Every structure is written in structure tokens, then in C-alpha cells.
Amino acid sequence: MKLRTCIPVLVTFALTLYLYLNSAESAYAMHIMEGFLSPGWSLFWWAVFLPFFVLGLRALVKITKEAPQLKLMLGLAGAFTFVLSALKLPSVTGSSSHPTGVGLGTVMFGPLPMSVIGSIVLLFQAVLLAHGGLTTLGANAFSMAVVGPFVGYFFFKLVLKATGKLKLAIFAAAMLADLSTYVMTSIQLALAFPSEAGGFAASLAKFAGIFAVTQIPLAISEGLLTVLVWNWLQSFNSEELSLLKRTMKGVAR
């Protein structure tokens, strides 16, 4: 990867980190804050998430062995996820709305590697930026690093097969990966805090409705931004994308 293609990502990453580390305001949760879920639900979501993490590690090891030149592209996917998911708007109590950034890495490498990349991003934000928490990392990672990428990948393949238009498929993948993350987060919150009147369904409608106000515009914006970044990669990283097409899942197929 050419140095000039790395500079914008590194500058954006550094600026975001600086602003959040030097912010005097209280940080909102990265999805679900530390201690917000009961120990039972925290353990449950960790148990659901960990198998995907293990499979993702195996996929990443395979990628780096077969095509070590793609390590910088993996780093770019992680930086893109970190920067976008750090741009938050306060939403439902104990949570927040923001882009997820997992769509780009999903269409390049497939959903399994993003289970690792996304969870590492969430871990860094929990430790360095006080967004989210360690006990709730399993729940947050399952929604953003598992559900989002798998849904995005499914619709990427579906739209690409139906229309043959790559950029439309990338837009759909990024937008729906974002929206599905928040549908899953709403389900997690509704399961943990069912409404006294109406139970799980009423609570789900409440959480999803509040999220939708901010998340639908954010998801559309993320889809457009991801397409713009893809255009940039095509212009300056054609060799790496050609290697992806030969060796990887995602855009490659």
C-alpha cells in the first residue's frame, strides 16, 4: 500500500483519538455501558460471541499466511471501523447511536475476520475511551462484530447477484450492517429489560423506535461514505484489491 494512501487514515485516527481523550464531557456507552447488563446476560452474550471470535481468528491467520501483503488492508479496515464507530450521538439510556464502520472490511474480507477486528475496536474503545465496558463486550461485539457483518455480507452478495452493480452492493452492505447492529442491540436491551406492560415486544418497539430516529440517517450516510472510500481504494490501491479478488472472500467473489 502506498504511503499516501495510509496518511489520511492515520491522521483521522489520531485526530479522533486526541479529541476523545481530551474531552471534558462524560462519555456515553459504546453500545451498552459497563455494568448495564446483569451478570447472567453478560455471560450469555460472551458465550454466544466467542465461537465466532475463534473462527474469525482462524480466518485471519489464514489470510495473513496466504497473502501477507494484505495486512495493511486489514489495518485500514480496523482504522475505518474505529473512526466511524467513535463518532457517537447519545440515544437510549445506557447506549448510543453511531456508524459502525464494519461494512468496508466485510466486503473486502468477509464476515468472520470482522468478528475479530470489530471486537478489538470495541476493546480499545472500552479501555482507552471509556465507551462500553469489559463485562458487556460480549454483547456489544455480538451485535456490531458478528450480526452486522453477517447481515451486511448476505445483502452484499444478494444485491450483487441481483443487479451486478458492485457499488450498489457495497452501499447496501454498509447500510444494512449498521441497521442490523442496532436491531440486535434493541433485542439485547429488550431481553434484559422487558416492559412491565407488554413485555419483550413492547420494550423492543420502544428501543428500536428511539434508535431509528438517529440510526436510519446515519446508516444511509455510512453507506455513501463506504462507497466513497471504495472509490478511493480503487484509485490508489488497485494492486491490493486485485490480490483480494484472487485470494479472499467478500468483493473477491
Task: Please provide the spans of the model-predicted regions.
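N-terminal secretory/membrane targeting signals
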Residues: M1-A27
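Hydrophobic transmembrane alpha-helices
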Residues: A27-L104
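Short helix-perturbing small/polar motifs within transmembrane alpha-helices
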Residues: S143-S186
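Hydrophobic cores of alpha-helical transmembrane segments in multi-pass inner/ER membrane proteins
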Residues: W46-L55, A145-F155, I220-N231
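Membrane-helix interface motif
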Residues: L19-A27, S186-G198
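Hydrophobic alpha-helical transmembrane segments
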Residues: K71-L76, S115-S119, F142, K167-M175, ...
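C-terminal transmembrane helix-loop-helix hairpin of multi-pass membrane proteins
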Residues: A169-L179, G198-R253
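Alpha-helical membrane segments and adjacent membrane-interface helices in multi-pass membrane proteins
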Residues: S85-G148
